[in-house]
Every structure is written in structure tokens, then in C-alpha cells.
């Protein structure tokens, strides 16, 4: 793989020129109204009241460079491109338990009772619709608040009815769906997932190979709503739904929010490769006690997460190019469910490296993080960027949003980029392009080098 940071992602097909402004309010549809979703919703309302700041959100905090040479300037992302405003978001969603967003947020324990008391009214009015659930895909959960239907196609149509009613009731013309549900068991695309026709036949025939997340994704796309997959399981990543997204002109992205330990890997590993330091092994373990940890305590769901977390190092280190440095390293990933820790995830990494004359060294990382606190701003950014992509006429897989995912979906057979800094450049260069600014390149460096050359 050519690793030049100037490489651009495949630009999704444009349906029209220009970007429609974000007029009116924006609907946010969330399958899985749990800790992440309620932390997001509470946070948006608290920030609006001046009781918190949106740290972790690029759309709300980051400024990027535009121009070059003697015309360098930094502009906030939200000022560079036309984004919706947090105050314009209208939330709705599904869950397999009936508690409203305030009750769920209290049970999750991510935010203090004092903080939640200030937004109780805003949270209590958000009651989830009955969810689509299949326990064979999430074995450690039970659902009491679920939809029933004669077929999976009937369930998809029921979701479409929910979406359309939500849009009408709230006078919305635009919406985005972000999967915040639990990790489903590991699966790979099969014959049924290859074409839209075979997939729809499978919906009608109640095919076991169709997971609930795929039903949500299908319903979302059929209603013209962009879909982002925050979990490691397959949903819009199957050929049938990629085809549907392209046919309908809808933006999709995924998969698996990059929040804690994997984020740190995609920061540290590029540094090791850049310095040509060898790697003997990378041992990673986590403890977490929230519902995500409970779900991942099942081997099927854990495998989906393990595959997602394990593939980043090879992509970054390129052992095929550097077999002496990275050709034979050991990589171990584990997650342990530890209920007392709740949403406060802790990750330990032991990294055995080699330097000059093969001399051994170690790096130790102890990351005490808060899962939903890291995930909420990712969801917020994806809401705004997926809406931007849709208004800009970008359809299909949004490779430029790889920055937010552990296992980025790709529009073709290429392997995804995992280097966080390259991913960030891909994202910001897409924003520059949409703003009709020049993409960041090497021109400034080249001019500076020219000045240093003695003729």
C-alpha cells in the first residue's frame, strides 16, 4: 500500500454540484438508546445551557488550516462548511427496554445525578420505540420491548413506519441514523448478502443470516436516511446494502467507533513505524462493566470486537515491507467483564519493542477512560458529517470518515487506512474540497527546501 499522506480517499459519487444549506431541524435516529445515546443527548442539552463544553468533538472544537505559503489561516470546521447546529437536533430511537432517556441515563451512571437533573425534562420526553431484536445475535441480553412480525420484511416495514412518523410529527425533511446498539455476533458476508434481490428475498423468508442491525440499515436507506454503523458487526458493509445506498443516493459509513485502546494504538503505532523501531509484541487487555462489557462476555460478540481491534497494527506497520521490524510480532487482545467498573473502562497495553543493535525496550500504557464520554462526541460528529455528505450529494461509503472507526468500511476492495493522522488528513482534505479550498499538500515544504539549497 502506498502510504503517502497526500493520498486522497476515493471520492464518493457526487449527484449534484453545490451543497444545500442545512435548513430546518435535523432528525437523529438511534437504534440502541443506552449509555452512549443518552450521554450524547444529555450532553447536547447541557452544553446548550452552558453547563459543559464539547471536548472531543471536531465539529465543535477543531480549527483546520486552509491556504498555503503566505496566506495560511485557521478556520473552525463548523465555519468552513455548512453544518447543522446542535440546537437543531431532534432525537428519537429504539430500544429493547421501555425506559425513557432520563431513566436510562440514571441507570447507566455515566453522568452524575446533579447533571442529569438539569436536563431531566428534555430526557424524559424521549421514550424509545419497540426495537427489532434477535437473541441469537446478542446472546447475553433479554428484550421485553420488542417488535413482532410475520417476517423480517414486516419488521423492516415497521421500522420504516416509525421513521416516517418521526419525520412527519417533528416536521423534519432530513435525518441521520447512527447505530449505537450492542455488538452482534461475528459473521461474514454470505451468498444472501451479495445482491439486493437476494437480501430482500431473505427478509421475506426470515433468513437467519440477516441480523437486526441489517434490518435497521435497510429501513434507514429505504427511507432516504444516511446510516452510520458504530458497532463491529456487519450491517451496511454487505454488498447488498452498499448497492442499495448507491441506488438510492444515500451516504453510509462504518464501522465500530474508535474510542479508547484502539485509538491509542493508531497514535502509537505510526510513531514506531516512523522511527523504524521494531515490535516484538503488543499485549492489550481491558476491563469494563457496562452493558457493552456484558454483551462482549459472549464469545460470539467478542469475536466481532476482537477482529475489529486486531487488524489495525498490520495496516499501519506494514510487515510485508518491513519483515525484520514487524514480520513476527505477537498481538494479543482481550476484554474482561468486570461489573464494579461500570462505564469506566480501563485498558492496559504492554508493548515490547527493539531499538539500535536489537536492544529491548518497553512501553506501558494504562488508559483509564470513560467509554460513553469518548463515544458521545464521535456520534455527534458523525451526525453532522453524514448530514453534510448527504446534502453535498455524496453517496455510498464515506471513506473520508475512517477517522472515527476501528474497522473502516471501504467502497472497493482496497484495505482501509488505520493511521489516525493519515485518516485525519483524509477527513480535513475532504472538508477543504467541499469548501472549495485547496487540499493540503507539500507545496509549502517544497518552497522552504528550495530556499535552503545552495546553488
Model region roles, listed by residue range:
Residues 198-202, 219-229, 306-309, 332-342, ...:
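Short, mixed-charge, low-aromatic patches
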Residues 227, 251-254:
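Histidine/cysteine- and/or acidic
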Residues 233-248, 287-298, 315-324, 342-355, ...:
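Short flexible/disordered coil segments
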Residues 309-399:
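Glycine-rich, aromatic-lined ligand/substrate-binding cores of catalytic
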Amino acid at each position: 500500500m502506498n502510504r503517502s499522506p497526500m493520498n486522497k480517499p476515493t471520492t464518493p459519487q457526487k449527484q449534484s454540484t453545490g451543497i444545500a444549506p442545512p435548513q430546518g431541524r435535523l432528525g437523529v435516529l438511534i437504534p440502541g438508546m443506552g449509555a452512549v445515546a443518552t450521554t450524547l443527548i444529555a450532553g447536547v442539552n447541557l452544553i446548550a445551557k452552558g453547563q459543559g463544553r464539547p471536548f472531543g468533538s471536531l465539529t465543535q472544537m477543531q480549527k483546520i488550516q486552509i491556504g498555503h505559503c503566505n496566506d495560511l489561516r485557521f478556520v473552525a470546521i463548523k465555519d468552513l462548511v455548512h453544518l447543522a447546529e446542535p440546537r437543531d437536533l431532534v432525537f428519537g430511537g429504539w430500544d429493547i427496554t421501555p425506559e425513557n432517556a432520563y431513566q436510562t441515563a440514571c441507570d447507566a451512571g455515566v453522568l452524575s445525578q446533579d447533571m442529569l437533573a438539569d436536563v431531566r425534562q428534555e430526557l424524559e420526553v424521549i421514550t424509545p420505540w419497540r426495537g427489532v431484536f434477535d437473541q441469537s445475535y446478542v446472546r447475553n441480553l433479554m428484550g421485553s420491548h420488542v417488535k413482532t412480525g410475520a417476517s423480517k420484511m414486516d419488521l423492516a416495514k415497521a421500522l420504516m413506519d416509525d421513521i416516517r412518523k418521526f419525520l412527519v410529527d417533528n416536521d423534519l425533511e432530513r435525518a441521520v441514523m447512527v447505530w449505537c446498539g450492542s455488538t452482534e455476533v461475528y459473521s461474514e458476508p454470505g451468498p444472501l448478502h451479495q445482491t439486493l434481490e437476494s437480501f430482500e428475498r431473505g427478509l421475506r423468508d426470515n433468513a437467519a443470516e440477516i441480523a437486526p442491525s441489517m434490518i435497521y440499515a435497510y429501513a434507514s436507506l429505504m427511507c432516504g436516511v444516511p446510516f452510520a454503523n458504530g458497532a463491529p458487526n456487519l450491517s451496511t458493509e454487505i454488498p447488498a446494502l452498499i448497492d442499495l445506498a448507491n441506488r438510492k443516493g444515500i451516504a453510509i459509513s462504518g464501522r465500530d467507533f474508535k474510542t479508547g485502546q484502539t485509538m491509542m494504538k493508531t497514535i502509537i503505532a505510526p510513531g514506531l513505524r516512523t522511527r523504524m523501531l521494531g515490535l516484538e509484541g503488543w499485549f492489550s487487555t481491558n476491563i469494563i462493566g457496562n452493558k457493552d462489557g456484558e454483551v462482549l462476555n459472549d464469545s460470539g460478540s467478542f469475536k466481532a470486537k476482537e477482529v475489529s481491534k486486531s487488524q489495525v497494527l498490520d495496516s499501519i506497520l506494514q510487515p510485508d515491507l518491513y519483515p525484520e521490524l514487524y514480520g513476527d510480532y505477537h498481538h494479543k487482545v482481550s476484554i474482561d467483564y468486570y461489573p464494579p467498573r461500570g462505564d469506566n473502562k480501563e485498558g492496559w497495553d504492554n508493548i515490547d519493542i527493539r531499538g539500535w543493535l536489537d536492544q529491548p525496550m518497553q512501553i506501558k500504557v494504562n488508559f483509564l477512560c470513560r467509554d460513553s464520554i469518548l463515544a458521545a462526541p464521535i456520534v455527534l460528529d458523525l451526525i453532522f458529517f453524514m448530514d453534510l455528505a448527504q446534502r453535498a450529494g455524496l453517496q455510498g461509503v464515506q471513506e473520508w470518515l475512517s477517522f472515527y472507526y476501528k474497522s473502516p468500511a471501504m467502497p472497493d476492495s482496497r484495505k482501509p487506512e488505520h493511521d489516525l493522522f493519515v485518516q485525519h488528513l483524509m477527513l480535513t482534505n475532504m472538508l477543504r474540497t467541499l469548501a472549495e479550498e485547496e487540499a493540503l499538500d507539500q507545496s509549502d515544504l517544497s518552497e522552504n527546501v528550495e530556499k535552503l539549497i545552495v546553488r
